[in-house]
Amino acid sequence: MYNVIFLGAPGSGKGTQGEVVAKELKLAHMATGDLFRKAIECGDELGDTVKSYMERGELVPDEITISVVLKHLAGLKDVTGIILDGFPRSLRQAEALDEALVQQGQGIGRVIYINVPEDELVRRLSGRWVCRSCQSPYQSGCAEVTKGKCSRCQGELYQRPDDTPETVKERLKVYFSKTAPLIEYYRSKGKLSEIDGMAEISEVTKRIISAIKCGK
């Protein structure tokens, strides 16, 4: 099974690219955000804990994230490969993933890092809207924001009070402090491909697919 990791800050477009590339290469797309949303929908203690972090715009702690993701991976059947979108986000998560994959006789084939300048990330995130029910994110100007409804669950869209440029910068600072070591971790293993996230969406997709195919 060929496993690919997508790394990129919030607002880098890795979720959109993950869905498109997974469809093109016939790989399963596993977005951590979707797994969290499913946990929230369950309404149990784990889901409530995840929801509290997401509503504050904070990263869900490692141990909770690892449990949610590894449980999902263990249940996957009849897939040729997986795109891991949003996981791992720290060295602790990366090590837990490596250990779990080794136990299954697998590994990571390629790591895609979508690089977008911080000022552009701040611009994108400051214009973000979120579904009040399932936490799906949308960008200002899109059809869903115009209608005020989530296309996934028809929930109400709103802007978080802490999605201001100042607060977004602080969140990105925390994100990069955890992710920078992760990028070097995979670079040292010869697995990392860095993609310019400022290119046209279709061009970014082409470069990602090329990097994945070259890595096989």
From Swiss-Prot:
Region described as LID: 127-163
Binding site for AMP: T32, R37, E58, L59, V60, G86, F87, P88, R89, Q93, R160, R171
Region spans: NMP: 31-60
Any GO CC annotation of this UniProt entry: cytoplasm
Pathway annotation: Purine metabolism; AMP biosynthesis via salvage pathway; AMP from ADP: step 1/1
Keyword Mitochondrion: no
SUPFAM superfamilies referenced in this protein's UniProt entry, alphabetically: P-loop containing nucleoside triphosphate hydrolases (SSF52540)
Catalysed reactions listed for this entry: AMP + ATP = 2 ADP
One GO-annotated biological process of the protein: AMP salvage
GO molecular function annotation: adenylate kinase activity; ATP binding; metal ion binding
EC number of this enzyme: 2.7.4.3
Repressor as UniProt keyword: no
Primary location class: cytoplasm
Binding residues annotated for Zn(2+), in chain numbering: C131, C134, C150, C153
Role noted for this protein: Catalyzes the reversible transfer of the terminal phosphate group between ATP and AMP. Plays an important role in cellular energy homeostasis and in adenine nucleotide metabolism.
Record note on domains: Consists of three domains, a large central CORE domain and two small peripheral domains, NMPbind and LID, which undergo movements during catalysis. The LID domain closes over the site of phosphoryl transfer upon ATP binding. Assembling and dissambling the active center during each catalytic cycle provides an effective means to prevent ATP hydrolysis. Some bacteria have evolved a zinc-coordinating structure that stabilizes the LID domain.
Protein name, entry field: Adenylate kinase
Organism: Dehalococcoides mccartyi (strain ATCC BAA-2100 / JCM 16839 / KCTC 5957 / BAV1)
Taxonomic classification: Bacteria, Bacillati, Chloroflexota, Dehalococcoidia, Dehalococcoidales
Gene that encodes it: adk
